[in-house]
Amino acid sequence: MPSLKSLKTRVSSIKSISKITRAMQMVASAKLRRAESRLAAARPYAKRMAQVMSLLAARAAGTPNALPLLNGRGKDQTHLLIVTSSDAGLCGGFNSNIYRQARDRALALEAAGKTVQFYVIGIKNAPVIRNNFPGKTIHETKREETSPVTFENAQKIAQDLIQRFNAGEFDVAHLFFSHYHSVLSQVPTETQIIPAAPEGDDTKNQAAANDASSGAIEFEPDEETILSTLLPRSIAVAIYQAMLENATSEQGSRMSAMENSTRNAGEMISKLSIQYNRLRQAAITTELVEIISGAEAL
């Protein structure tokens, strides 16, 4: 049975931790509002970029001079899994959820006889990937490469990926991140960014291609020239969008985790306080009994 002193020490420690988690919850709440604003501003551009690329891809796909970034190199043996994560912890299951989805995809690809490599954006998922897939990580970003989240940082990562693709290091690249819906809902998401995957419904893509072919849509200059400029940018936009989604999901997950921690701390303090008061009452009762027994003996 714990002593009064140990219970008092535990209550004091939990109260201190509760103050920290409450402060972290407030900080995460403030950061979340800013992240939501940035994400809301970026989503329409990313969506429109995907629509433009879908249209251009539908028109140019299959042509003899189609770019490798658009149609690939005719093989899909080596798959690069770009796994994002946070640079800080204490954000619930945010990082582990992304890792699990990437892990499941990696195991499925290996079972199909494919070669899997990892490109890790963010610090927290790097160690677990190294431990579970030793020797398969080709790059791990440093904190200064991803913080703060800017389009310039996303462009640098995109340029590195394109150089590695052109050098033949991989054939297909999949991007894993957490799509933000709300404070209570962040969904691990996978998207193929190299070569460019068709967006949306195939029927709509074909209709767009037919419109473009029939002259309903005119391109100046030609589609291939536009693609050579927009394809690298679309990869950077996809990475930037994933980083923004991750940053917002991270703060939402951290806010929720710290709120739960603060509530659990309050419940623990209540239980320990009751236990402390009962022990103290029992000790006082014992002392009174001893005093009365001693008085009667006299």
Curated annotation (Swiss-Prot):
Main location: membrane
A single GO molecular function term of this UniProt record: ATP binding
Keyword set, alphabetical order: ATP synthesis, Cell inner membrane, Cell membrane, CF(1), Hydrogen ion transport, Ion transport, Membrane, Transport
Signal sequence region: none
PROSITE patterns, per the entry: ATPASE_GAMMA
Compartments, record wording: Cell inner membrane
Keyword set includes Ion transport: yes
GO biological process: proton motive force-driven plasma membrane ATP synthesis
HAMAP family for the chain: ATP_synth_gamma_bact (MF_00815)
Family that this chain belongs to: Belongs to the ATPase gamma chain family.
Protein name (database record): ATP synthase gamma chain
